[in-house]
Amino acid sequence: MIGKLKGVIDSYGEDYVILDVQGVGYLVHCATRTLQALPSSGEAAVLSIETYVREDQIKLFGFRSDIEREWFRLLQTVQGVGAKVALAVLSTLPPSDLANAIALRDKAAVARTPGVGPKVAERIVTELKDKAPAFANVDPAVVHLAGAVDDDRAPRPVKDAISALVNLGYGQPQAAAAIASVARDAGEGAETAQLIRLGLKELAK
């Protein structure tokens, strides 16, 4: 089994890179984000590798970090998610954003992945919710707030403030994290406008 490859970029395809390792060209499938981050042809590169062995073929999948590779494996434990969908998810969301989206139950963020419908997105955030904290530095208070919002238990000003930040262009995980942080300091009596103002300051840090 191949766990890592270190060589020189030979060429690129739509969803793969050919890595020249001492004269042998390895075709390695990668997420779009990974391909975009790799150097130009002729330059050195290192990839963590996941090897798939089938009766009729051997496929190599490459990642910039071991964490990204672990997410690739983890995603495929979800029903309906194979290697192609897992790569598509990692093309849409980097590991840190994916971990936050799962911890915060942000199905919409995962569903932005081409080929991932609402049902699969929901399975991903549901089935992996207990595993995300191992990869993400997510404040437990933020996770608690996300659960409260999802279950319609959060105070109205909190929900309205998060919605306002999302409407301003911030992602749901970012908005929830910012409002969760400032809501603790502002107290239970904080109004929506105050939370929005404080949330924007938090996001500007």
From Swiss-Prot:
Region (Flexible linker): 144-154
Location (main, coarse): cytoplasm
Cellular component terms per the entry's GO annotation: cytoplasm; Holliday junction helicase complex; Holliday junction resolvase complex
Residue ranges of the region described as Domain III: 154-205
Keyword presence, Cell inner membrane: no
Region of interest called Domain I, as start-end residue ranges on this chain: 1-64
Region of interest called Domain II, as start-end residue ranges on this chain: 65-143
GO molecular function: ATP binding; four-way junction DNA binding; four-way junction helicase activity
Membrane-traversing stretches: none
Pfam families to which the protein is assigned, alphabetical: HHH_5, RuvA_C, RuvA_N
GO biological process terms, semicolon-separated: DNA recombination; DNA repair
Sorted UniProt keywords: Cytoplasm, DNA damage, DNA recombination, DNA repair, DNA-binding
Record SMART domains: HhH1
Leader sequence residues: none
Localization annotation: Cytoplasm
Keyword Plastid: no
Main function: The RuvA-RuvB-RuvC complex processes Holliday junction (HJ) DNA during genetic recombination and DNA repair, while the RuvA-RuvB complex plays an important role in the rescue of blocked DNA replication forks via replication fork reversal (RFR). RuvA specifically binds to HJ cruciform DNA, conferring on it an open structure. The RuvB hexamer acts as an ATP-dependent pump, pulling dsDNA into and through the RuvAB complex. HJ branch migration allows RuvC to scan DNA until it finds its consensus sequence, where it cleaves and resolves the cruciform DNA.
The record's note on its domains: Has three domains with a flexible linker between the domains II and III and assumes an 'L' shape. Domain III is highly mobile and contacts RuvB.
Family under the similarity heading: Belongs to the RuvA family.
Subunit structure: Homotetramer. Forms an RuvA(8)-RuvB(12)-Holliday junction (HJ) complex. HJ DNA is sandwiched between 2 RuvA tetramers; dsDNA enters through RuvA and exits via RuvB. An RuvB hexamer assembles on each DNA strand where it exits the tetramer. Each RuvB hexamer is contacted by two RuvA subunits (via domain III) on 2 adjacent RuvB subunits; this complex drives branch migration. In the full resolvosome a probable DNA-RuvA(4)-RuvB(12)-RuvC(2) complex forms which resolves the HJ.
Protein name: Holliday junction branch migration complex subunit RuvA
Organism field: Afipia carboxidovorans (strain ATCC 49405 / DSM 1227 / KCTC 32145 / OM5) (Oligotropha carboxidovorans)
Lineage: Bacteria, Pseudomonadati, Pseudomonadota, Alphaproteobacteria, Hyphomicrobiales
